[in-house]
């Protein structure tokens, strides 16, 4: 009986005996100091396949480590750490433990220099389909926001409302970490204003994306990549910034990476106080006028949080979760004085408005990656986004009229014969905009062989916007009641389904890629008036389907020359505010509203790129042309004494241009990057009769326009002795025509200096050194000309202190030697 019990136990133990295992132990020391090194990454590699295994760990405070229960076999133990030269040890496990003893890691002076002396990193580099801008290399970026940071990117412009344009085209899509992340034209200006620049790793500009990416945005895509790194060990930074306007930033970032888990977290607080103002001059052909001038300071506080982790489940499976969110509060006021001599109109209108609002937003993402092999994988992600918050705005108007019944032959008397009549109007507007969306992506990649590559996938985006707005009016603050004709609740839904496939390859020096993307999307809108419910208002429906092909051809030529030609089809969809017929009364003399009949506009985009590199110099030439039909544009018309602005599909457009980038490195100390963008804009003539809100038929027309414009940006970085670096950025935009007028030219200069002291970094910068950032435009109508001038921000001086930490055991070499640029061609070119 006893033997019967022992026999099954022995049989059960056979598999365990067949898979005998042992522990691998060791200790890591710094070669220069002999001190133990903690949080050094220890990774196990299969010696036969040379593939990393899921088994890994990090050293303890005394430098020791243990890899437990390693099955019998031949392995390589890889020891890696920030700022150190990696080492590898061959190990064989056979029925027992193995101690590989002490490993002495030597400092990698070059790598340490890259980690700590951030001022010498390349600001800009080229990849096959995009330009990449490093934020840490931008000295003038310290203490700024994402919106301000975009102003320093070549060919990118941010106007006074925070709206972004690329190569003179405002139809640009903005992503965060490669996804839309709930950003819409309604909310992205506020969101970009609240993201601290210190949380951003890099900005990618993709002017002609392939079929793999969304076709949204005829100008291209700007991708903001937040900091997340997989360098072995733990490291982070703390940053504090103050500015001359009483604002400031505080932030903390932390990263941890081991063989099994990568994690990151960051938190930032931003406080801002900005000035702003406006000037308007409207002249009529009969000699009358309406003018205004005002100031509009604004303020805000916000908290930004991001965190995430990736679990390397096996050698072939990764599971990740990440997210970011923000809580913000803003407030401000505007004081505007209007004067007019238009017959029958008021002669003075004193307008005082106040505003405040909250921004609450979050992005949560779950991802899974499975690799069948290193060249064949699928990546699946699902993300949820929420942005919104209540806002409040009040308007007080003190209006003065000339009394038409005034008798100059009689004594002026306020009660019997007043020369002027006065009216007070009070308004309050409440809005609670909310946007919710889901993003689902599945991307399959198969490097079929050394020549051919296949990519295919699905992308779904499901969004809903709900923005109720109510307005109260009265002759005093006490008697205000709701204004039914100014109540609005706009509900907007947009569901997008997309399938794509691209096939490419490389045969010797020739590369090609061709792709096709199909998208179907359904738009559903409702605009509710006062007292109406959802069931009372029929839904406005639009169903769309379109195909978007792309073709990329590239040829590598001798002597580091590269040429590329590509074609894509893109579109610009109307966003919520452009479709909402509700009137915005924030300025009683300039009222804007949307057009629910607005249709998407489609573009065909062509680019020809050439790049030539030398050891210390580089030049890149990009010629492009974009044809757009049925383009969406703002149109303005005068009805009575009020200027109305709405949206309509008018005219066709051809944009063409050339972008020149020249990079020079002099005496190993001076980096000079110059970008010049020359573009021509042709708009066909158009005319139609417009039915105004008051029932008047107003003929509108636009002349054929052919305008040339250009912009230039120069970034100069100088590496000085004593770990000092200096940077200056100058920007100029020429005059540019619009559908009914023009935008005047403008220029600005930013400067900054940085000092590195060990793990500390001190930065002093000045944004808009000459206080010259202003937005000036002219609008022409049948019987009037209007000039507008607006500004915000102004000259701002910032001081920033930053402390970096990590598991590095020795001080870096502070010698600021430069490095020659990579001469490998267009594939990955540092600037």
Where are these regions (language model features)?
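Surface-exposed extracellular loop regions of Gram-negative outer-membrane beta-barrel proteins
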Residues: 522-524, 559-604, 625-645, 767-783
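Short acidic/polar hinge/loop motifs at secondary-structure boundaries
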Residues: 68, 146, 179-207
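N-terminal periplasmic accessory domains that precede
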Residues: 99-104, 146-147, 188-190, 205, ...
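Short, acidic, small-residue-rich periplasmic hinge/interaction motif at the N-terminus
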Residues: 29, 43-45, 80-82, 98-140, ...
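Face-selective signature of the C-terminal outer-membrane beta-barrel domain
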Residues: 306-328, 355-528, 556, 560, ...
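Short, acidic Ser/Thr/Gly-rich low-complexity loop/linker segments typical of extracellular
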Residues: 48-64
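Transmembrane beta-barrel wall of Gram-negative outer-membrane proteins
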Residues: 242, 246-273, 288-334, 356-367, ...
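Outer membrane beta-barrel strand-and-loop segments of large Gram-negative receptors
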Residues: 293, 428, 437-441, 481-488, ...
């Amino acid at each position: 009986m006893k033997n019967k019990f022992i026999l099954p136990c022995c049989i059960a133990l056979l598999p365990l005996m067949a898979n005998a295992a042992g522990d691998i132990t060791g200790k890591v020391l710094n070669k220069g100091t002999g001190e133990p090194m903690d949080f050094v990454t220890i990774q196990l590699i299969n010696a036969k396949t040379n593939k990393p295994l899921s088994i890994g760990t990090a050293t303890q405070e005394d430098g020791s480590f243990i890899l437990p229960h390693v099955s019998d076999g031949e392995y390589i133990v890889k020891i890696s750490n920030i700022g150190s030269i990696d080492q590898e040890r061959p190990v064989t496990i056979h029925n027992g433990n193995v101690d590989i003893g002490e490993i002495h890691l030597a400092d990698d002076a070059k790598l340490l220099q890259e980690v700590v002396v951030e001022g010498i990193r390349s600001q800009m580099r080229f990849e096959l389909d995009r330009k990449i801008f490093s934020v840490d290399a931008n000295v003038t970026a310290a203490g700024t926001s994402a919106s301000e940071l975009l102003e320093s990117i070549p060919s990118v412009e941010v106007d006074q409302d925070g709206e972004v344009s690329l190569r003179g085209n405002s139809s640009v899509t903005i992503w965060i970490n490669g996804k839309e992340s709930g950003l819409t034209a309604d909310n992205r200006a506020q969101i970009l204003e609240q993201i601290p620049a210190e949380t951003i790793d890099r900005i990618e500009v993709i002017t002609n994306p392939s079929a793999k990416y969304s076709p949204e945005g005829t100008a291209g895509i700007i991708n903001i990549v937040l900091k997340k790194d997989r360098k072995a060990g733990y490291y982070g930074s703390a940053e504090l910034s103050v500015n001359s306007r009483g604002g400031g930033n505080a932030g903390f970032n932390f990263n941890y990476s081991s063989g099994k888990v990568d994690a990151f977290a960051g938190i930032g607080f931003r406080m801002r106080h900005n000035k702003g103002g406006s000037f308007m001059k409207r002249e009529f052909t009969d000699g009358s006028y309406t003018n205004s001038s005002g100031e509009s300071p604004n303020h805000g506080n916000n908290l930004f949080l991001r965190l995430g982790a990736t679990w390397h489940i096996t050698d072939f499976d990764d599971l990740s979760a990440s997210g970011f969110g923000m809580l913000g509060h803003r407030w401000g006021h505007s004081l505007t004085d209007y004067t007019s001599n238009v017959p029958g109109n008021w002669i003075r209108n004193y307008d005082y408005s106040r505003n405040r609002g909250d921004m609450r937003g979050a992005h949560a993402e779950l991802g899974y990656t499975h690799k069948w092999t290193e060249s064949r994988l699928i990546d699946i992600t699902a993300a949820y986004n929420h942005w919104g918050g209540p806002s409040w705005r009040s308007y007080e108007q003190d209006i003065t009229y000339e009394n038409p019944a005034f008798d100059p032959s009689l004594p002026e008397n306020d009660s019997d014969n007043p020369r002027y009549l006065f009216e007070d109007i009070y308004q309050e507007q409440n809005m609670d905009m909310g946007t919710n969306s889901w993003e689902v992506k599945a991307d399959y990649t198969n490097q079929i062989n050394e020549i051919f590559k296949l990519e295919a996938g699905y992308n779904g985006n499901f969004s809903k916007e709900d923005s109720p707005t109510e307005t109260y009016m009265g002759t005093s603050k006490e008697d205000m009641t709701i204004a039914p004709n100014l109540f609005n609740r706009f509900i907007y839904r947009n569901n997008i389904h997309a399938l794509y496939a691209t096939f490419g390859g490389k045969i010797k020096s020739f590369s090609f890629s061709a792709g096709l993307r199909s998208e179907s999307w359904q738009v559903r809108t409702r605009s509710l008036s006062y007292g109406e419910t959802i069931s009372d208002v029929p839904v406005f429906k639009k169903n769309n389907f379109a195909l978007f092909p792309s073709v990329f051809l590239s040829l590598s030529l001798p002597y580091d020359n590269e040429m590329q030609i590509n074609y894509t089809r893109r579109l610009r969809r109307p966003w919520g505010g452009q479709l909402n017929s509700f009137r915005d009364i924030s300025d009683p003399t300039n009222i804007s509203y949307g057009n629910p009949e607005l249709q998407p506009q489609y573009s065909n985009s062509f680019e020809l790129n050439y790049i030539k590199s030398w050891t210390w110099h580089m030049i890149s030439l990009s010629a492009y042309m974009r044809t757009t039909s049925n383009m969406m544009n703002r149109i303005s018309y005068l009805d009575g004494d009020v200027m109305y602005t709405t949206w309509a599909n008018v005219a066709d457009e051809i944009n063409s241009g050339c972008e020149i980038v020249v990079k020079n490195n002099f005496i190993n100390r001076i980096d000079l990057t110059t970008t010049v963008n020359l573009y021509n804009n042709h708009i066909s003539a158009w005319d139609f009769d417009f039915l105004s809100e008051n029932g008047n038929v107003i003929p509108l027309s636009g002349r054929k326009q052919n305008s040339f414009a250009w912009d230039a940006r120069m970034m100069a970085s100088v590496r000085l002795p004593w770990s000092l670096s200096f940077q200056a950025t100058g920007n100029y935009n020429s005059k540019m025509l619009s559908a009914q007028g023009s935008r005047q030219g403008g220029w600005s200069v930013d400067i900054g200096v940085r000092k590195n002291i060990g793990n500390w970094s001190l930065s002093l910068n000045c944004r808009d050194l000459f206080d010259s950032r202003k937005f000036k435009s002219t609008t022409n109508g049948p019987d009037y000309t209007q000039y507008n001038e607006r500004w915000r921000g102004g000259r701002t001086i910032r001081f920033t202190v930053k402390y970096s930490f990590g598991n590095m055991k020795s001080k870096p070499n502070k010698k600021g030697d430069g490095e020659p640029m990579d001469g490998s061609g267009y594939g990955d070119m540092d600037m």
